[in-house]
C-alpha cells in the first residue's frame, strides 16, 4: 500500500531539515517574515474565475496554499521571483496561486485532490492534462524546470555534443533510438514522454553512436535508460505504452534505495514510498562499524529476492525520524528491519544481526511472521469530553461498544485539527447526557489506522452507528452542526438491534 502524500511530505521534510545548514534556516526565517508581501507577477485566482483562467492558457502552474502554512510562506518570494522571470519567456509562462483554505475555494481543493500545502500543479492544454509539479522550490530551479516543461517532451539528439549537454550522469535520462522518426514505436515513445515528462527527461535520436557508451550497430528501435546507480544503463525493445511505462518505473529506482541526508536520493525515496508494492526497510546508524557488513548482506538479499513483489530501502537513523514516527519505531530497537506489505500490515525484527536478514525475509515470504501494530498505550484515565482511542482498542471502542461514535483521526501538528479540537469538546459536552453517543479521537500519527477507515488527510472524521453503518463526516465544522448531524443520524439501542436481527444470516462455512 502506498503511503499518503501528507506522510511522504513529512518523511522527506524532516530529512531536508536535518541536512540544511544554519544559513538556510536564517534565509527561511527571513522569507517567512516577508512571505505576506503582495505579489505582482503571480496571478491570484479563486473559484469564480479559476476555470476561465485555465481555459485562457495552454500552460499554467497553480500553487494551492494556505495562509498559515510555513512552507507556503517560504515558497512565496521564490515563486514570485520565478513568475517575474518567466513572464519574460516567449510565450510567457503563467504562475498562479489559490488560497485553498478559503471556504469558497475548498471545492477546488477537493476537485484537484489537494492533500497538503503547498501543492503545485501544471495545467496543460487549457486544463485537459493536469500533472503534479515535481521540480525545485527555489526561483532559479523553478524557472529552469518550467522552461523544460513548455518545450518538447523529448529532444532530438543530433550530435555527441547534444548528448553531452542533455545526458547528466547524475540523473535519469531516457533515449529512444530509431531508424526513422515516425511509426508506431516512435509515436508510443513520444506519448510516454509527454505523460511522464514531469518525472523524467527524454531524448530521441537516429544515431546510437552519439550517446555515451554508444554503439552504432545497436538493433533499432530501442529504448535506453541511463541512470546514476546499479548497472548505469538498461535497454528495452518493448514499445507497448503500458510496457514502456512499467520498464521506466522498474528501472528508475535503485535496487536498494538509500534514506539519508543527501537530497539527490529524495526523488527515489518519493517513488519508494508512493509504491503500492511491499517495502522492506533496514534502519541502522551509518556512522558505526557494522554498517558495511549490514550493507553487503542487505544488497545481496535484494538481489536474491529481486523477482518478488518487494522493494528495498536502507536508512540512516539520523535522517529517518519521520519514518520512525510513521511506523511507530524507537531508536533503541536499532538495528532493525521492518516490512510493510501491500495491505499495510507491518512485520518487525528489532536488534537484527546481518546473518539474520535473509532467513527473516524468507520467513516473511513463507507467511510465518506475525504482524506488528503501532499503538499508543490504552489510556488508564479517559474522562475528558472527547475520548481518546488508540490502535489497540479502536475496534472495541468504535465497532463493539453499542454506541454511536463520531471518531476524529488527527495529527498533532495539523492546524485544522487544532481549530477543531475545542469545537469537538463543545459538541461532546452538549451530548454528554446522551448515553448512546460518544465523540472520540485518535492520533493517526502515533497509531495504525484500521483499514476500514480511509484517512488521506487531517482531520478525517467518521460516524459509526451501533449496527455498523459507517459514513465519512463531511458536514459543517461548528459544534451546533456536529450535534445536529449526530442527533439526526444516530441509532437507539432498539433500532440497532432491529437492524442486526433483520440482516441476512451468513451461511455456515466449512473451515476445513
Curated annotation (Swiss-Prot):
Record site feature (Lowers pKa of C-terminal Cys of second active site), residues: 477
Superkingdom, taxonomy of origin: Eukaryota
Motif residue range(s): Prevents secretion from ER: 509-512
Disruption-associated phenotype: Accumulation of large quantities of glutelin precursor (proglutelin) in the endosperm.
Enzyme class: isomerase
Pfam families xrefs: Thioredoxin (PF00085), Thioredoxin_6 (PF13848)
Protein name per UniProt: Protein disulfide isomerase-like 1-1
Protein's organism: Oryza sativa subsp. japonica (Rice)
Gene designation per UniProt: PDIL1-1
Amino acid at each position: 500500500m502506498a503511503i499518503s502524500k501528507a506522510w511522504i511530505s513529512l518523511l522527506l521534510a524532516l530529512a531536508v531539515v536535518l541536512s540544511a545548514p544554519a544559513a538556510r534556516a536564517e534565509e527561511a526565517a527571513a522569507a517567512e517574515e516577508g512571505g505576506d508581501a503582495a505579489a505582482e507577477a503571480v496571478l491570484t485566482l479563486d473559484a469564480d474565475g479559476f476555470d476561465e483562467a485555465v481555459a485562457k492558457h495552454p500552460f499554467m502552474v497553480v500553487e494551492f496554499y494556505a495562509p498559515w502554512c510555513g512552507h507556503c510562506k517560504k515558497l512565496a518570494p521564490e515563486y514570485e521571483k520565478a513568475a517575474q522571470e518567466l513572464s519574460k519567456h516567449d510565450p510567457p509562462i503563467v504562475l498562479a496561486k489559490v488560497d485553498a483554505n478559503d471556504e469558497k475555494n475548498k471545492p477546488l481543493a477537493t476537485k484537484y485532490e489537494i492533500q497538503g500545502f503547498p501543492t503545485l500543479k501544471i495545467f496543460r492544454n487549457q486544463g485537459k492534462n493536469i500533472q503534479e509539479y515535481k521540480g525545485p522550490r527555489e526561483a532559479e530551479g523553478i524557472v529552469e524546470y518550467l522552461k523544460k516543461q513548455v518545450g518538447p517532451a523529448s529532444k532530438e539528439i543530433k550530435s555527441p555534443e547534444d548528448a553531452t549537454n542533455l545526458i547528466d550522469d547524475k540523473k535519469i535520462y531516457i533515449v529512444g533510438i530509431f531508424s526513422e522518426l515516425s511509426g508506431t514505436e516512435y509515436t508510443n515513445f513520444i506519448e510516454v514522454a509527454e505523460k511522464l515528462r514531469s518525472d523524467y527527461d527524454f531524448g530521441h535520436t537516429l544515431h546510437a553512436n552519439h550517446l555515451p557508451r554508444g554503439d552504432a550497430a545497436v538493433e533499432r528501435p530501442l529504448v535506453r535508460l541511463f541512470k546514476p546507480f546499479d548497472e548505469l544503463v538498461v535497454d528495452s525493445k518493448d514499445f507497448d505504452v503500458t510496457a514502456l511505462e512499467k520498464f521506466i518505473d522498474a528501472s528508475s529506482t535503485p535496487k536498494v534505495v538509500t534514506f539519508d541526508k543527501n537530497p539527490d536520493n529524495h526523488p527515489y525515496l518519493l517513488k519508494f514510498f508512493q509504491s503500492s508494492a511491499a517495502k522492506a526497510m533496514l534502519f541502522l546508524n551509518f556512522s558505526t562499524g557494522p554498517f558495511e557488513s549490514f550493507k553487503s548482506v542487505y544488497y545481496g538479499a535484494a538481489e536474491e529476492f529481486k523477482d518478488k513483489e518487494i522493494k528495498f530501502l536502507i536508512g540512516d537513523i539520523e535522517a529517518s525520524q519521520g519514518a520512525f514516527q510513521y511506523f511507530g519505531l524507537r531508536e533503541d530497537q536499532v538495528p532493525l528491519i521492518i516490512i510493510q506489505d501491500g495491505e499495510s500490515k507491518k512485520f518487525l525484527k528489532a536488534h537484527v544481526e546481518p546473518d539474520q536478514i535473509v532467513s527473516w525475509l524468507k520467513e516473511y515470504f513463507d507467511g510465518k511472521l506475525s504482524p506488528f501494530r503501532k499503538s499508543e498505550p490504552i489510556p488508564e484515565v479517559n474522562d475528558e469530553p472527547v475520548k481518546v482511542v488508540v490502535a489497540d482498542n479502536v475496534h472495541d471502542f468504535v465497532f463493539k461498544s453499542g454506541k454511536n461514535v463520531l471518531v476524529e483521526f488527527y495529527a498533532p501538528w495539523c492546524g485544522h485539527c487544532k481549530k477543531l479540537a475545542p469545537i469537538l469538546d463543545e459538541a461532546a459536552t452538549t451530548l454528554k447526557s446522551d448515553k448512546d453517543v460518544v465523540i472520540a479521537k485518535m492520533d493517526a500519527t502515533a497509531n495504525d489506522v484500521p483499514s476500514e477507515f480511509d484517512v488521506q488527510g487531517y482531520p478525517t472524521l467518521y460516524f459509526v452507528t451501533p449496527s455498523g453503518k459507517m459514513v465519512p463526516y463531511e458536514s459543517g465544522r461548528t459544534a451546533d452542526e456536529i450535534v445536529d448531524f449526530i442527533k439526526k443520524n444516530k441509532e437507539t439501542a432498539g433500532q440497532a438491534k432491529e437492524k442486526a436481527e433483520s440482516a441476512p444470516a451468513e451461511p455456515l462455512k466449512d473451515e476445513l
